Structure formats: C-alpha cells, structure tokens
C-alpha cells in the first residue's frame, strides 16, 4: 500500500456473482436483527431493569448499531467484498494475524449460531408435532437450507426476503395490536402505564442497564451481513448508501415502537418463564390463536437466522481461502456462483445440532449461545477500527479520494464511538450471569486460533500481494 490505490474492480473475484438486489439487502439486514433475541430474550431485561431501562438500553444499542452500519457502509462502498470486515482487517490492521483471528472466530461463531438456530427451530416444530424428535427436524431444516444456498445467492436472497417479511409483518401487527390495547385501556381510570412502576424508573438501580446491555446488543448483531452481501450485490456503490441509513432508522423504529408498547402494557414484575412477552400482549389484546401465531413467527425467525448463518459463514470461509487463511478448496464456486465446499463444511459441522438426541434441546441451545459469546462485539470493533484507518489512509494519500463514495458522518467520532462502546459492553459481560462462561469459552477459542496462526501462518510477502 505504498502507492496510490485506485477504485476496485467492478466485479467480484473467485466466481461469485452479483445476484442480490436492493430489496434483498434491505430485508436481509432488517430481518436479520429481528429474531428470538427480541421475541423471547426481551423478557429478561424487562424483568431486571424495568420497562424504562429496557427502552433506553435498546435505543442506545440501536445507536451503536447505526454507527457501525455507517462505518461498514463506507468500507463496503469503497471495497465491496464478501469477506467484509475480515478482508478489511487484512488491508488496514497492522498485522494480518488479527484478520486471521477475527475471520476464524466469526466463522466458528456462525457455525455455532447455525446449530443453535436449528436446535431452536427443531424444538419449536417438535412442540407442534411431538411425535417427531427434535433432531429429525434439525436435520430436515438443515438439508433444505443447504440446498437453497447451494443453488445461488439469489435463491438465498429470495428465501431470506420472505422469511424476514414474516417477522416484519409480525412486528407491525404487534405494534398495531398494542396501540389498540393502549387506546382501550386509556378509558379505564384504574389503568396506569407500566413504564414507571412502584414509584421507580429502574427497579433494581440504573447500573443494571450496563449489565443489561450485554444481552441487548446481541439482538442487533447480524446486521453486519450487509457487508458480506455487498460483494454479491448489483452496483453496491449506488445501492449501499441508500440502504445503510434506511436500515438503521427502520430497525430503531421497529424496535423502539415495539419496546415502547411493551414498556406501557407489559407487567415488569412477571418472572421470565419462556413465554414471549409478545404472546402475552397478543393474548390480552383479544387476538385469537395468539400462541400459535407467535410460535410460527418465532419458528420462521429461527429458520431465517439459520439461513443467514449458512450464507455468512460460507462467505467468510470463501474470503479467508482467497486471503490464504484457509484451504484453497473453500474458495471454489459451482455453476451458480456460490462457494460449494464452504457451504458443505459449514453444514457438516452444524450437524452438532443432532446432539439434541442425547442432550435436552433447551439446555443444548444455551450451551451453543454461550459459545458464540462476544465475537459480534469484536467484529464491530474491527469495523470501526478499519473505517478509521481507511479514512486516515485517504487523507494521507495512500488511497484515492474517489473511493469515498459514501462518507460516514462525524469522522472520527463515529468510529471511536463504535470502538469504545463495544469494548465497554464486552467488559460489562463479565458482570452478567453467564459472563465467566462466555469469557472463558471465547478466550479458549482465541488462544487456539492464535496458536494455529503461529504454527501454520502463510508467507506474509505472498499474502500482502493479494490485498488491495
């Protein structure tokens, strides 16, 4: 990177094809953040920090997400690549070791997330059809999603578009139902909004919001998929600037309104028992079949998350193969322009979900979620750092200014905000209930990956020649 770098090539390398369109990108990122973390996981913050604290925590996490999206948007418009921040880390981090480490960490986290999502979907389907064991549903869903992803990126995009549309429709319906419920309750003199209860805004103290953030932030992670998809999107430098801000604002709007409804009507003193607060609101709003409706929505959310996991993990492995961080076979594509071997190895490892034949599904799901830990925060920190280094490189003349097709606002404060807040959230995780387990699991993975780097690292001179 000693000479002025010009615009990257218009077409992706390695056989990938630009089959994704703007609507795929928008719905993929929008639906990617609406999952079981919102539908079920929100019960825990509501109980621990109260409705007002939960609303503040989600709005703050949404702000971090929007700032991260802006940083990623600048990088993806300049260098559309399916490896996203892993490839950018190779370009802008002082040592390729971090690109190698975050790439493998992120891939493993998606593989475990895939197994967890398959377990969740299988468990939900088992509740509807008790005669069929959980592991059989896991296998069937995995085979179907693998076949879809092996066809083309467009097939993945269409599948994800409609699965995400179901979730978005459920959120809109929930907001409308909650609005009707609030309007009807306003006529009763004995009704009081639950936003402030027992004379307190924060039942267990405002400091619990910091601990709550460690749960809340994971609900938004996955939105960085837009960076992976940029490498297979038509005219990414034109589409991405239009999509980035729209995605962020829509997510904050949907989350904000949905949580505001819960904050006004959902009793915070209810102990989390596995039931979705959304089901509680639908039931009390008088909508028949609310339990079945939300069960189907949560099932589609789990399948959607599994679909995204196959896509994200396979593209990350494809990128690392191109950067000589993984075997070259994972960089090969089929006639549909998809990395076939990367998809197959991801699906093969996800068969760990079949262990639900021997381990209770709910317990196994928690094990897998704990294994993913803080990788999402590390990915967001990497995005903020790379955007900061890229903008500095443009200023000192290393890269041409015409690469700034989209400018992240408030530089350098946006990047600094992303880095500092995500680091603080990682530290806050240590004080959560599962913090020690998460920290130890992630530390073990990181040490193992770092050891493999020093044992099998490629020739750096050859590696550097592939970047730019």
Regions found by a protein language model. Give the residues of each.
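Helix-loop-helix junctions that connect adjacent transmembrane segments
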Residues: 9-16, 55, 130-133, 164-295
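C-terminal membrane-solvent junction of multi-pass transporters and transport-like membrane proteins
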Residues: 162-163, 329-340, 380-433, 463-468
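Membrane-interface loop-to-helix entry segments
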Residues: 122, 135-190, 221, 244-248, ...
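A generic transmembrane alpha-helix motif of multi-pass inner-membrane proteins
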Residues: 181-182, 363-367, 371-379, 408-468
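Hydrophobic transmembrane alpha-helices that form the core helical bundles
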Residues: 44, 56-57, 66-150, 155, ...
């Amino acid at each position: 990177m000693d000479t002025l770098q010009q615009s990257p090539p218009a077409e992706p390398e390695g056989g990938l094809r630009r089959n994704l369109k703007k609507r795929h990108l928008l719905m993929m990122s929008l639906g990617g953040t609406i999952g079981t973390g919102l539908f079920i996981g929100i019960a825990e913050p509501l109980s621990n920090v109260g409705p007002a604290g939960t609303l503040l925590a989600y709005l703050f996490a949404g702000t971090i997400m929007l700032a991260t999206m802006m940083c990623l948007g600048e990088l993806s418009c300049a260098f559309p690549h399916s490896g996203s921040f892993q490839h950018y880390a190779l370009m802008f981090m002082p040592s390729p070791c971090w690109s190698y480490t975050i790439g493998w960490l992120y891939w493993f986290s998606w593989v475990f997330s895939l197994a967890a999502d398959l377990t969740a979907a299988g468990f939900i389907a088992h509740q509807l059809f008790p005669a069929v064991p959980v592991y059989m549903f896991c296998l069937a869903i995995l085979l179907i999603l693998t076949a879809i992803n092996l066809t083309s990126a467009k097939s993945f995009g269409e599948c994800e578009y409609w699965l995400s549309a179901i979730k978005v429709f459920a959120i809109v319906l929930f907001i409308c139902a909650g609005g009707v419920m609030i309007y009807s309750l306003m006529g009763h003199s004995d009704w009081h909004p639950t936003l402030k209860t027992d004379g307190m805004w924060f039942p267990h103290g405002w400091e619990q919001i910091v601990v709550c953030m460690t749960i809340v932030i994971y609900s938004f992670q996955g939105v960085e998929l837009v960076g992976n998809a940029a490498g297979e999107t038509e005219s990414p430098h034109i589409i991405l600037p239009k999509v980035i801000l729209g995605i962020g604002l829509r997510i904050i709007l949907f989350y904000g309104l949905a949580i505001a409804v819960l904050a006004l009507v959902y009793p915070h003193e209810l102990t989390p028992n596995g039931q979705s607060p959304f089901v509680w609101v639908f039931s009390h709003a008088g909508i028949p079949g609310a339990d079945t409706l939300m069960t189907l929505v949560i099932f589609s959310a789990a399948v959607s998350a599994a679909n995204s996991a196959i896509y994200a993990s396979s593209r990350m492995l494809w990128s690392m193969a191109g950067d000589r961080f993984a075997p070259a076979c994972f960089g090969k594509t089929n006639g549909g322009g998809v990395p076939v071997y990367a998809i197959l190895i991801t699906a093969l490892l996800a068969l760990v979900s079949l262990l639900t034949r021997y381990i209770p599904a709910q317990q196994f799901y928690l094990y897998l979620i704990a294994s993913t830990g803080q990788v999402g925060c590390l990915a967001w920190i990497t995005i903020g750092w790379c955007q900061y280094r890229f903008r500095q490189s443009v200023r000192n003349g290393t890269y041409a200014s015409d690469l700034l097709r989209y400018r992240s606002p408030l530089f350098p404060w946006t990047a600094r905000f992303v880095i500092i807040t995500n680091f603080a959230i990682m530290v806050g995780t240590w004080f959560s209930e599962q913090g020690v387990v998460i920290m130890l699991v992630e530390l073990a993975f990181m040490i193992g990956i770092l050891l493999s780097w020093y044992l099998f690292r490629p020739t750096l001179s050859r590696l550097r020649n592939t970047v730019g």
